[in-house]
């Protein structure tokens, strides 16, 4: 069994914001798997699905970004899952917009949701699907930038990026992060 976590903030006011791209990917992954977020546990919305041979819980923590790790840590402990069973999808300021990268471990890059997950699972050594949102314009607070909404004209690029992130997540679940990284990151570099 695997746990896939899309990071974001609950509430309609955060829909379509850069910071909620993890929720968008989780929603699309569940939709493609024919699953719905019908369960509520660990202060999160959960959808049970199958990705290839793997049973997967897709999670959207409802604790707000800075406390996302509470739900993730509780779920890992409850289901007795290890860090190699965890895939977290989140926005990333350090990646160019619409670029998708898969990595294991590394720093949190100032992302409070990732910081919280690291603190509650005891390590950064889990798979992360990083979805690039780019850097804010000069003199703009990064918090204001990530809480800003994607522009209407960005729909096609965002949709393609979400599909790439869904595929990266699926590969991480089905192949394991190490094998999946070769495919996902090679594709991402080829798109440059």
UniProtKB/Swiss-Prot annotation:
Reactions catalysed:
an N-acyl-L-alpha-aminoacyl-tRNA + H2O = an N-acyl-L-amino acid + a tRNA + H(+)
* Site positions (Stabilizes the basic form of H active site to accept a proton): 91
User: Which keywords has UniProt assigned to this entry?
Assistant: Cytoplasm, Hydrolase, RNA-binding, tRNA-binding
GO CC annotations, alphabetized: cytoplasm
Q: Which residues bind tRNA?
A: 14, 64, 66, 112
Pfam families in UniProt: Pept_tRNA_hydro
Where is it localised? Cytoplasm
* Record's keyword annotation contains Ribonucleoprotein: no
- UniProt main location, coarse: cytoplasm
- Note the superkingdom of the native organism: Bacteria
User: In chain numbering, where does the site feature Discriminates between blocked and unblocked aminoacyl-tRNA fall?
Assistant: 9
Return the Gene3D superfamilies for the record. Answer: Peptidyl-tRNA hydrolase
Q: What is its EC number?
A: 3.1.1.29
**InterPro entries registered for this protein in UniProt:** Pept_tRNA_hydro (IPR001328), Pept_tRNA_hydro_CS (IPR018171), Pept_tRNA_hydro_sf (IPR036416)
Family of the protein in this entry:
Belongs to the PTH family.
State what this protein does: Hydrolyzes ribosome-free peptidyl-tRNAs (with 1 or more amino acids incorporated), which drop off the ribosome during protein synthesis, or as a result of ribosome stalling. Catalyzes the release of premature peptidyl moieties from peptidyl-tRNA molecules trapped in stalled 50S ribosomal subunits, and thus maintains levels of free tRNAs and 50S ribosomes.
PANTHER family assigned: PEPTIDYL-TRNA HYDROLASE
Q: What is this protein called?
A: Peptidyl-tRNA hydrolase
């Amino acid at each position: 069994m695997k746990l896939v976590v899309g990071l974001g903030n609950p509430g309609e006011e955060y829909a379509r914001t850069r910071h909620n791209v993890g929720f968008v990917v989780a929603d699309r992954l569940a939709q493609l798997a024919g699953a719905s977020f019908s369960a509520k546990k660990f202060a999160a919305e959960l959808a049970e699905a199958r990705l290839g041979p793997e049973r997967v819980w897709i999670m959207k923590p409802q604790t707000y970004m800075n406390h996302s790790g509470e739900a993730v840590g509780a779920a890992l402990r409850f289901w007795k899952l290890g860090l190699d069973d965890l895939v977290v999808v989140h926005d990333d300021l350090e990646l160019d917009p619409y670029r998708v990268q898969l990595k294991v471990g590394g720093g949190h890059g100032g992302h409070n949701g990732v910081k919280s997950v690291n603190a509650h699972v005891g390590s950064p050594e889990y798979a992360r699907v990083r979805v690039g949102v780019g850097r804010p314009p000069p003199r703009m607070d990064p918090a204001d930038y990530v809480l800003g909404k994607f522009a209407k004209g960005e729909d096609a690029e965002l949709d393609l990026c979400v599909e790439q992130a869904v595929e990266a997540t699926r590969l991480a679940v089905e192949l394991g992060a190490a094998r999946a990284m070769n495919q996902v990151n090679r594709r991402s570099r080829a798109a440059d």
